[in-house]
Amino acid sequence: MGLPPLEFSDCYLDSPQFRERLKSHEIELDKTNKFIKELIKDGKSLVAAHKNLSCAKRKFAGSLNEFKFRCIGDAETDDEICIARSLQEFAAVLGNLEDERIRMIDNSGEVLISPLEKFRKEQVGAAKEVKKKYDKESEKYCAMLEKHMNLSSKKKEVLLHEADVQLDQMRQHFYEVSLEYVLKVHEVQERKMFEFVEPLLAFLQGLFTFYHHGYELAKDFSDFKTQLSISIQNTRDRFEGTRSEVESLMKKMKENPHEHLALSPYTMEGYLYVQEKRHFGTSWVKHYCTYQRETKQMTMVPFDQKSGGKVGEEEIIHLKSCIRRKTESIEKRFCFDVEGVDRPTVLTMQALSEEDRKLWMEAMDGREPVYNSNKDSQSEGTAQLDNIGFSIIRKCIQAVETRGINEQGLYRIVGVNSRVQKLLNFLMDPKISPETETEIPSEWEIKTITSSLKTYLRMLPGPLMTYQFQRSFIKAAKLENQESRIKEIHCLIHRLPEKNRQMLNLLMTHLANVAAHHKQNLMTVANLGIVFGPTLLRPQEETVAAIMDIKFQNIVVEIIIENYEKMFSTVPEMPQTNSQLHLSRKRSSDSKPPSCSERPLTLFHTTHNTEKEEKRNSVNSSAESVSSSNANSSANSTCTQCSNMNNLNASDPDLDVAKASRPNSLSLNPSPTSPPTCPMFSAPSSPMPTSSTSSDSSPVSVPRKAKALYACKAEHDSELSFSAGTVFDNVYPSQEPGWLEGILNGKTGLIPENYVEFL
């Protein structure tokens, strides 16, 4: 496993888990620092000791062979694997040259020793200095916080206000130092991948020049040397892009940290001081607490952020009630009492501020929970995958291929933003009919046209390859076997919504044509992947982990461009159909719970957005036109339309494949609390509707009770968490494939279809 990413949002929570992750990075930096010192020492011995050259080589080679790179993330790219393997390759080369005793090269000190010493002092040393500053500020902040918490509420309001201001200033300063430290740690960990290996590569290249006996060995090494050089350059290029992204994210976090908090499974979490009664008096112990409103479960872990602080034993409380403490009833400020179901005594807790106490009270007193207040990462744009959208992309592609296919830096050189917006406004003008495929006037520069194409794709409400399948595409790129990557991506492409797949086909055919002219325009498949990866697979949440996955986004786009004919012209070998999978699940349901892969995917489209989408796309096909124009008609006509669509799909095998893997784009959107008027997806106890079923014979879904066969933990706010044996009320098929809707403890939510049986 690689090193875990350090999120900037965790600097504000400063949780025990964050401290543990930070400590693992610090240990890795210490190991790297010690290893570089040892490597420099060994290198000097190798240069100075001609008589002991063989012994020095063995030690040096042994040091290289023992060190293992640890990259950030749970998988490595081909370039990182190549770089990580390079030390073992170097050691093997030195082992083969062990018997050759020739004097050291004159410039080895400049080639090898100086860069490593420079990296150790300027990068690793700088990280240590920032660490000292971080530890010092952490100590000061915690000490001041404890002192502040002990202030009596009977003091004058002016003094209390002044103390609050001082604490807030200290806290902000601590957050800034913490952010800078995390940034520096990430930077050093990334830099060592090229600034550390590159001097070693240069040193070995110098050895080959002076060793006549190693000429043949050098020829054998040249292929790996070339591959490694490319990998180092690719890693360096990615580092430059990643660093700018991370710095930009850090600046956004600094300016408004509350808008960039990471999504959390907890309703509320943070530090609280808990009053503990002793034999002589009481004491206040700092705990990191988390609370889940659905289960009314509160978890407390004793922890102090001071250096060397140990994590205590976890304690779980099932909440019964939460009452605010009156100011006059206790000397401490910001206090409230918590009563547990399984605890005989009441716990008194102290929040860090009045605002913090209000948040805890709102989370625990039965009011509406305060979930993540982040703004949507992507506001609804005017761009859509409708006739206008396809027309705009086709016009841009036609202009590029007829006028600028050989321009150097195509798609990499950006146009002037004002010109780009002007061209997009012109192309998106509703007065211009989308059926009119007029060419873009020659007055528009190619870089303006290419920037407009990229901007339009970024303006879509979601990325072209969808948020739903983003993690699946990334996982496919992380597969070790290239054939497996291609096969998995091929399947995922055919699971995309039809319009997304059509647009992706149009774009990839064009990019393959651009790559075919790379000798003139210098835009290779790799360069196009760098340009379009973040656009086609943009993350739903802007985090450090998402930035680290950019390299895999690029790999996905490269694979699609290189294999675009196979990706879009052939249908992949799809897994079992929905009905077969349903039957197999029913057979195995008595023996074991469904695996994670059997858990259906949810789309989480809101009624509002779907209606807007259907309205905009109503001109695309006669079937969609029928659906949108009759959305408010009776249940009879609605079911007739559904039956007609089933008959239409039965005549087209391609549509059958699409239907088995994604929801029907024509499905209506009933309210969350009312059953659908058309049985698009049947309950487990009823047979799956076939394409030949007429509207008259289509049964209307009747809400029933269902019992959970297995426990399930919700992965989204719209899902329900439950244990085995739980009984649900008012259960009926959902518009989401593989899901049911039901009511549990007064809350309506989604339930996996293969996790329950009807009563």
UniProtKB/Swiss-Prot annotation:
Residues 618-637, 679-701 have a biased composition (Low complexity). GO terms for biological process: signal transduction. The gene is arhgap26. It comes from the Eukaryota. Its main location: other. It comes from Xenopus tropicalis (Western clawed frog). This is Rho GTPase-activating protein 26. Residues 265-369 form the PH domain. Coiled coil: none annotated. It is found in: Cell junction, Focal adhesion; Cytoplasm, Cytoskeleton; Endosome membrane. The record marks 412 as: Arginine finger. Residues 7-262 form the BAR domain. The keyword Glycoprotein does not apply. Residues 701-759 form the SH3 domain. The keyword Cytoplasm applies. GO terms for molecular function: GTPase activator activity. GTPase-activating protein for rhoa and cdc42.
